[in-house]
Amino acid sequence: MTAGERTGVVLSGGGADGAYEVGVLKALTHGVSPATGYRPIDPEVYTGTSVGAFNAAFMVSRSGRPATAVTEELEAVWLERVANTPLSCGNGVFRVRGLPFQFLDPGCFLQPFQVLTNAVQDTFDLAKFSLIKGAQFATDDASLQSRLLSLIDLQAFISSQPIDQLIAEEISLEALRRSTKRLTIAASNWEAGVLRLFSKDEIADTVGTAAILASAAIPGIFPPVPVEGIPYVDGGVLLNTPLIPAIRDGATTVHIIFLDPLLRNVVLKPYPSTLDTAWRMLAIIWASNVRKDILIAAGINLILELLERGAPESASREDARTFLQVAWQMYRRMSEGGAQAYRKLTVHVYRPQSALGEGEGILDFQRARLHGLVEMGYNDAVNHDCAVNGCVLPGRPAGPGGNR
């Protein structure tokens, strides 16, 4: 790679399905993917949303160590700490409050003090929730139906204490501060409804790991996380696949890891549940947003190639339209103080060929499932095919897979 060029990795959100990202990272860093010319890579730029934010921060916080060793350590964390194993008391991400079955779990049976401590805390939290909701129900002027519906709140029964502890123990702020890699994490301002991108320096020196926790706070399941007094939730609400931030950080070769397949490969269920419908709606929104970003990347290549030929008037009507749209964005970027030497971009896309479980799968942390997702991601990277997944390559338009 020539001077000024950087390799970047973009990690999407998707809860437990994030184990798939670990498999792809493992293949890329071990040099077994055709996307890297079968050469191991050690990316300089990472961006991530939700679970992708955790994976990205983990990789960046281990800067200075061989990337192969770091991905193997990340895999071990997923299979030993994140996963729900026969000897663990639940998973490493969330706990269901007041669940009596945990006392029958062999892993919990071996940790009676932890179970007792959790039970006391859960009782307190549920009592607090009941008092607050009861007061709201009694004093609200809304209709009885509206007040009854307002009592439904999954957040009351979900504790994020496990992921709080996981992030605090696995992501060192001092290590982030020393890292030579670039990191950007996406989170959504729950008050203003705007996206915020947290840089590595902001996380290490100002806001701490709360930014990573906020990026993974799935609305309706986990409560908003206050960062500098402002509530933030999952970055996937507004930007589930932060490609443009990676390009702005200087990445010229970008590896995007999606956690959902091409929409056309996901068969519509004849009798979908509400969760199925909501999940497909989100997938369509995410697909639309990231397709625009991929087209921008292809447009940057087009502009540079037309300028090299010195004859933009010879372009097709579609090329000319793309030229004008992307040229305007490049001009705005430069006028806002982001002037830089634009380079041609290479974008490789990785995604599962079938649905990983859709809505319900994002909370399924069973070890066997996570191990299978790691293997799937690894194999998909080993068998990477631009003709199937879609790539942006200099001199070529985005492949058919770019249209999700």
Residue map of PLM features:
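Short, basic and Ser/Thr-rich N-terminal targeting/leader segments
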Residues: 5, 179-181, 343
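Short hydrophobic beta-strand that contains or immediately precedes a catalytic carboxylate
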Residues: 11, 46, 232-234
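Short polar catalytic/cofactor-binding loops
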Residues: 13-16, 191
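Hydrophobic/aromatic beta-strand patches that form the interior of the parallel beta-sheet core
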Residues: 47, 186, 255-257, 346-350
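Active-site gating loop/helix substructures
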Residues: 135-251, 256-257, 263-276, 362
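C-terminal helical/tail subdomains of lipid-metabolizing enzymes
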Residues: 146-148, 162, 167, 306-404
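Acidic, Ser/Thr-rich peripheral helices and adjacent loops at domain boundaries
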Residues: 268-309
